[in-house]
Amino acid sequence: MAEEACQVRRMKLGSQGLEVSAQGLGCMGLSDFYGAPTPETNAVALLRHAINAGVTFLDTSDIYGPETNELLLGKALKDGLRDKVELATKFGITASEDGKFGFRGDPEYVRIACEASLKRLGVTCIDLYYQHRIDTTLPIEITIGELKKLVEEGKIKYIGLSEASASTIRRAHAVHPITAVQIEWSLWSRDVEEDIIPTCRELGIGIVAYSPLGRGFLGLPRFQQENLENNKILYEKVQAMATKKSCTPAQLALAWVHHQGDDVCPIPGTSKIQNLNQNIGALSVKLTPEEMVELEAIAQPDFVKGERYDNNMVTYKDSETPPLSSWKAR
């Protein structure tokens, strides 16, 4: 099995000057969505272990918890650690008491959300601020216009989008350069390769791959009985190839993402230091062009059965916004 010993290299994310660790850490699971929250002492220890190991690109959101994940990072980054990390958080998803999600990108909300995140994180500036999901009730230009003001005011350094369509990315980028687009990309989720990845590369936008270990493969619709048997075959083939490579299936899947290009930064999440070390070990797994072809033949985009999410969460396929002309006409 590949070990942690390899050094975590640095990479340029996007074209605006942001430099991050080549592998980031998705922090959501420490507070939300995957069972009970990790005890604070353990979570802080994991975050600090990651930073000391060279994984300095930390990803959170105001909806994780909600809010408690940002508070956790704020505690972990005390004692001078803030300057050692690249801190990314997100806004734009709201949650009602009955668990239904809403989406807001109006200027007033953008500003309020940013100020609240700054306070919870205990920082004066957010390195990378994403719109977590697109508000389709108003033109994307309106949201990005307010984010641009926050950049000019020094409250955020760089702007990102999450789960945005190619056309939405283009429209946003025309208002202010987008540094990164966060999207689910893994052996189990490859639909973004058709349109979104080429668009990002054309515009010089960095790609942040969330759930690079196939979160959606092991849960939600893809784990339902009607899809399970088909998807199990895929996993077994990956497992067999991992055995040949003397690594774990997770390391092989993560290595595949790392081999997609120098503009791609995966952000796997974990609550255990042992798993974090194994994820770092994926950086030392080298795949030949022939092995990449073999892996991609195993994981054809149309082979995985089931949607990534249930009907309570939207993706880039639901992110088209009204034209700016319609907003001006109001």
Swiss-Prot record:
Active site location: 64 (proton donor)
Cited Pfam families: Aldo_ket_red
Family annotation (SUPFAM superfamilies): NAD(P)-linked oxidoreductase (SSF51430)
Organism domain of life: Eukaryota
MF GO annotations: oxidoreductase activity
Keyword Cell wall biogenesis/degradation: no
Keyword Ribosomal protein: no
Disulfide bonds: none
Alphabetically ordered keywords of this record: NADP, Oxidoreductase
Binding site for substrate: 132
Residues noted as binding NADP(+) in the record, renumbered to the chain: 211-221
EC number: 1.1.1.-
Gene Ontology CC annotations of this record: nucleus
Family statement: Belongs to the aldo/keto reductase family.
Protein name: Probable aldo-keto reductase 6
